[in-house]
A protein has these predicted regions:
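Carbohydrate-binding/catalytic loop surfaces
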Residues: 351-358, 397-416, 443-464, 490-511, ...
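Aromatic-lined, polymer-binding surfaces characteristic
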Residues: 317-320, 324-327, 338-345, 350, ...
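Aromatic-rich carbohydrate-recognition surfaces in CAZymes
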Residues: 368-488, 512-516, 520, 649-671, ...
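Catalytic cores of carbohydrate-active enzymes
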Residues: 155, 170, 397-398, 518-635, ...
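Short strand-turn-strand beta-turns centered on an Asx-Gly dipeptide
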Residues: 784-788
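Surface beta-strand/loop "capping" patches
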Residues: 737-768
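Inter-helical turn/loop segments and adjacent helix faces that build the functional surface
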Residues: 143, 147, 283-284, 429-438, ...
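Anionic coordination/interaction segments
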Residues: 1-364, 377, 382-389, 425-430, ...
Length: 811
């Protein structure tokens, strides 16, 4: 693989050259502090929320430069008239070509090592498990036979505060800056006097800090003075020209933190030190953290704890073994890690997006369903947080922030169809049906009917009494069922799953076929919950509702060879053969399978149409053909360049919907081929693909783009990861939770003769060996549990805390 490879155990991706096609990044995080770091230490950090509590400066357009970041400049003063040697220990920002370089992105840490000028350096970046900071554990070795005297300059650029307000009003926000060197404790503080979101102004009580375990010989806090006029991090005047002025205060201008250290290295000698960067409430807490981690032993202990935690989280649960080692590497390690990152930070912080902060309702619902098999406690926590966003009328806020509460934007209409599936999966995984009786508050805010604003509402968000989780779900689904247009399909409103279909319902009349299908799936799941609690009458009510919506879909949503996508405010059907552009959409074909709406000849026709119009060498396109000009009745979906984003890209999230659908249809080889086309470690040309080989992209540029077909975009924070994990483990390998136990029903490529899944479930561990002697794609002939044959495909939990052998014979 060009540019790098996985370690032998698959737990690290090793990058062999600093100049990758795009920055290849990692997320280092605990539950509150997060650092995003590239292979050259570019990136930023935040505390609790990447918008409102950004620590370091960064913006998406910086991706092309991979700056600024977490740097250590090195300078060797040479004898006589020889010019000083200056370089950076992470290649960036000086870009001095090293003699040797390696970056290892691991689970919870990143290591950057290089050799230059006879000095080997290694920096391990990580975030401790329980503290609100990041540590840079630095090692320097003099590889020569002469003593070396080095000046070292750890460096970051502050943002400190609300990222969006900084982008909009940087000239004003900078005036709030106060950065200073604390002489008593030898550290630099970064602070803003006020927290400002719009006109909401309050005192900013958090203090960012930067320190080192080495003796401080100098310091800098003012960016312009440090860099010099018209310079960037690539030419810092203070270092290159020896103009380090020890300015202790930065007031009302761009601030940095840079410390100066002097290190003498005898021949072959190694020295270690640690840099501490973080944010706390109050200066005293920062000082305590700095003093703690100036002790190298404490820093190393924290590193081991971080490594142990992530290894336990990732390796200590589901493990698969198949004939495809690339498949195994992704499923066993990297997609799990990506699912964790998405669960912790949703769709907010990245190198690609603006970083709007908070967590999304529908995103978190899907992410927490995906993680339930490896961390059901986190799923339970998220379920109750999401449910608290539901209003009494059944609508919901689109998300929430740990710093500013529920999101007050107009929500997309699909929020109502995701949480029921998550609750169902949680109960199937744990048996904890008591969660349905948990009391959760209802949200009260300015929105009425999910569309209109109550002009009489004063203030922000409050609660409006409470109800059980079961009642919240019922209200959620009933609102979606009743909020329909003239054809009886749910209104699309501002948008459904596809954010970019944002004009089809701006008059609040447009309808969504896809949303109707997703609703049918959720209605059926709610029937199961009703049966679980013994409410027969309500179960029958929701069976009728599911049938009613199914009949409507098949009456007005079928186009002859596939399902339409929806109807605009003016009644124009799109996702139909008569529409110009966007004639067939992937989502409505996939969800016709997922919801059970498609039956008989419709079932076969949508598979044929999907293969004919949507599938390609890089995966299934979101729709076909792409829009070539603006369609005002649909919105910005038609404004993107052909093949990018929602305009007919290979949208990986949606493509995995279809992978699950194909497994439901028994098409194992097609499902496997489809999932492989999207796996980042299976791409053939990384100069084309560009994105990281170890995490999923949001999309690949689609086939109608003139020259970028197959390029990966918007990695890490995408619903793709959760659906990829579920598709692989629960549908292709076919080991999935059920209320009464583990359902084992694989859908394999015909070439696979055997595979296995190690699956913890309700306190037991089930080692499932799957045999496929005749190369079938679907069908279970026999199942044996600890040598005893059982009837059917359901393995009932033994609940004895032991390991059990399960032999599955397909046929």
């Amino acid at each position: 693989m060009k540019y790098g490879h996985f370690s032998s155990d698959g737990l690290e991706f090793i990058i062999s050259h600093p100049v990758t096609p795009t920055p290849w990044i990692n997320y280092l995080t605990n539950d509150k502090y997060c650092a995003i770091i590239s292979q050259c230490a570019g990136g930023y950090s935040f505390y609790r929320d990447c918008r409102t509590d950004r620590i370091l400066r960064w913006a998406p357009d910086y991706k092309n430069f991979d700056r600024p970041g977490r740097y250590i400049y090195a300078r060797e003063q040479r004898a006589g008239n020889k010019k000083s040697k200056v370089w950076s220990l992470t290649y960036q920002p000086l870009r001095v070509e090293p003699d040797a370089y390696e970056c290892r992105h691991g689970l919870g840490y990143t290591t950057i090592a290089q050799k230059y000028n006879g000095v080997s350096s290694r920096i391990i970046y990580f975030v401790p498990v329980d503290d609100d900071c990041e540590l840079w554990l630095v090692s320097l070795t003099n590889e020569t036979n002469k003593e070396k005297k080095l000046e070292l300059y750890p460096y970051v650029e502050w943002l400190v505060g609300d990222y969006h307000e900084e982008l909009r009003y940087r000239n004003i926000m900078n005036l709030y800056n106060r950065m200073w060197f604390d002489e008593s404790h030898k550290l630099i503080f970064g602070w803003k006097t006020a927290f400002w979101q719009g006109m909401n102004i309050k005192e900013f009580k958090n203090f960012s800090f930067f320190a080192s375990s080495l003796d401080v010989k100098g310091y800098a806090t003012r960016k312009t003075e440090f860099l010099g006029r018209y310079n960037t991090e690539e030419r810092p005047e203070a270092i290159l020209e020896g103009k380090f002025r020890n300015t202790a205060l930065c007031s009302g201008e761009d601030g940095i933190a840079c410390l100066k250290h002097v290190v003498k290295l005898a021949p072959k000698q190694t020295k270690e030190f640690v840099v501490v960067l973080g944010e706390t409430e109050g200066q005293s807490n920062a000082i305590k953290l700095v003093e703690k981690y100036r002790d190298l032993a404490q820093a190393k202990k924290a590193l081991e704890a971080t490594r142990d935690l992530w290894k336990k989280r990732i390796a200590g649960n589901i493990v698969v073994k198949t004939p495809d080692s690339d498949f195994d590497t992704m499923v066993n390690t990297w997609v799990k890690y990506q699912v964790y990152i998405c669960n912790l930070w949703s769709r907010s912080p990245s190198f690609y997006h603006e970083g709007s902060g908070g967590r999304g309702y529908r995103d978190s619902a899907q992410d927490s369903e995906a993680i339930v098999s490896i961390n059901h406690e986190l799923t339970r926590k998220r379920i109750l947080q999401i449910a608290a966003l539901i209003r009494r009328e059944g609508t919901s806020a689109p998300g929430w922030s740990d710093t500013s509460g529920p999101n007050q934007h107009r929500p997309n209409k699909d929020h109502q169809v995701w949480l029921t599936a998550t609750v169902r999966s949680y109960i199937q995984e744990t048996g904890d049906k008591a969660i349905l009786d948990a009391y959760v508050p209802y949200l009260k805010d300015k929105w009425v009917g999910g569309w209109d604003i109550d002009l009489q509402h004063k203030g922000g968000t409050t609660t409006d009494g409470e109800g059980t989780l079961f009642e919240h779900l019922e209200k959620n689904l009933n609102f979606c069922f009743n909020d329909v247009g003239e054809r009886g399909l749910p209104k699309i409103g501002h948008a459904d799953w596809n954010d970019a279909i944002d004009a089809a319902g701006k008059k609040h009349k447009g309808e969504s076929v896809w949303l109707a299908q997703a609703l049918v799936r959720s209605l059926k799941y709610f029937v199961e919950l009703c049966e679980l609690v013994g409410d027969k009458a309500k179960a029958e009510e929701f069976v009728r509702k599911a049938k009613t919506m199914t009949d409507r879909i098949n009456e007005v949503g079928w186009d002859g060879e596939w399902y339409k996508r929806g109807f605009t405010d003016d009644g124009i059907a799109y996702g139909t053969k008569d529409y110009e552009g966007g004639k067939i959409f992937l989502n409505t074909q996939a969800w016709a399978l997922l919801s059970g709406v498609a039956e008989g000849e419709k079932f076969d026709k949508i598979l044929k149409s999907t293969a004919k119009y949507l599938d390609g060498k890089h995966g299934m396109a979101l729709f076909y053909p792409a829009f070539s000009h603006f369609r005002p009745e649909l919105g910005r979906i038609s404004m993107f360049s052909e093949g990018t984003k929602e305009n007919a890209a290979v949208f990986c999230h949606a493509a995995h919907f279809m992978v699950v659908g194909l497994c439901m249809a028994g098409r194992g080889t097609w499902a496997y081929e489809s999932i492989c086309k999207l796996m980042p470690n299976k791409q053939k040309n990384y100069d084309l693909y560009k994105a990281e080989p170890y995490v999923y992209a949001e999309y690949l540029v689609g086939p109608e783009n003139p020259y970028r077909y197959g390029e990966g975009q918007f990695t890490w924070i995408t619903g793709t990861s959760g659906w990829a994990f579920m598709a692989a483990t629960e549908w292709i390998l076919g080991v999935r939770r059920d209320f009464a136990g583990l359902r084992i029903d694989p859908c394999l490529p015909s070439a696979w003769k055997k595979c296995s899944v190690r699956r913890p479930f309700r306190g037991d561990v089930y080692d499932v060996e799957i045999e496929n002697p005749n190369g079938v794609e679907k069908g279970v002939k026999e199942i044996y549990v600890d040598g005893t044959r059982i009837e059917g495909t359901l393995v009932k939990p033994l609940l004895d805390g032991k390991e059990h052998k399960v032999r599955v014979v397909m046929g």
